[in-house]
Amino acid sequence: MQPQTTKYDQNASTNLDQDVNSSRLVKYAQNQTEIKEYLYAILSKEHPRLFEKYGPDFLAIDLAELLKDGEILCKLGSLLPASKVPNNPSTKFRSSKMPFVQMENISFFLSTCELVGLPHDEIFQTVDLYEAKDPYQVVITLMSFSRLANKIDASKFPHVVGARAARVKPNVPSKPFRLRTK
């Protein structure tokens, strides 16, 4: 009888968690430019000076670093119409260099996402962005937000980022034979 192998005996150079994390980081790198272009297209109309502090090539800045203070997220969330999001938390934005205020700004945007009905499993946690724990989850949230915001107000949110949600055709059962007319 052979001894049972343990995790210490394996010859694999990576484990499943590392593979998943590296896969998500690759997807993050692939999608962050599209997200930044979306944010610029939506926000530059209402807030033309918002991106000036990042310089002319803000597309070269990492998305997580760009969103870390919560300002861009709150400005995005505050564009939602008040009729659809009464008492919008994103309007409570405060500009600050203090970490707890920046994390609070991020949480204002996340509260707005919950209020508009974004699925809970598509909403990132504050540490996913602020500490860059899972930056791809931030991308997922912004993609989902873009789809939902487009449904709410297509005039302010004309663009959608990422794949469109599939519309499932409802399954209509056929009429039983005994009820069909002859």
Q: What are the residue ranges of the model-derived segments?
A:
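Alpha-helical coiled-coil scaffolding segments
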Residues: M1-K182
